[in-house]
A protein has these predicted regions:
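Short coil/turn connectors at secondary-structure junctions
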Residues: 1-2, 49-52, 73, 94-98
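A glycine-rich helix N-cap at a beta->alpha junction
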Residues: 73-92
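Alpha/propeptide regions of enzymes that mature by internal proteolysis
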Residues: 26, 30-57
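N-terminal glycine-rich anion-binding loops that anchor highly charged ligand groups
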Residues: 3-20, 31, 35, 49
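Glycine-rich loop at the start of a catalytic domain that most often binds anionic cofactors/ligands
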Residues: 61, 65-74
Length: 131
């Protein structure tokens, strides 16, 4: 089994303020570690469920938030941005058996998450699931 994990930061446990996800602010390092631990737990769960390959995309801001030292050895981490049209799920394709989204937030205006926002449509016009 091959698993793709895309990780954002605004939905990580305990995040309630933009300063907690801004690498220039003092609270950031605490939530950077929390994000890394949550992604590591997802990787370990995927491996325990039979994944032979786990690919992680750091999909928050600069793409350089996840601390690799927390990830299982067989995990491949994509850092930074390549300009790929799939953006937060770059390199996702039909060879993957599962997609996990860790630390994601709700859409703008939906409530329930103080950092809810929506992806820009500057590069993506439409995303369709289960069509």
């Amino acid at each position: 089994m091959k698993v793709y994990i895309s990780a954002d930061m605004e939905g990580v446990t305990g995040v309630t303020n933009w300063e907690e996800v801004d690498h220039n602010k003092s609270a950031y390092s605490q939530f950077q570690k929390q994000m890394s631990l949550e992604v590591a737990a997802a990787c370990e769960g995927a491996i325990a469920a039979g994944a032979k390959e786990v690919l992680v995309k750091d999909a928050h801001y600069s793409g350089r938030n996840i601390l690799p030292l927390y990830l299982p050895r067989r995990t491949k981490l994509i850092r930074s941005w390549s300009g790929h049209p799939y953006s937060m799920v770059q390199e996702l394709n039909s060879r993957f058996d599962a997609l996990m989204m860790i630390g994601y937030h709700s859409r703008a205006g939906s409530g329930g998450n103080p950092l809810a926002h929506t992806m820009s449509s500057a590069k993506i016009e439409r995303i369709t699931l289960n069509e």
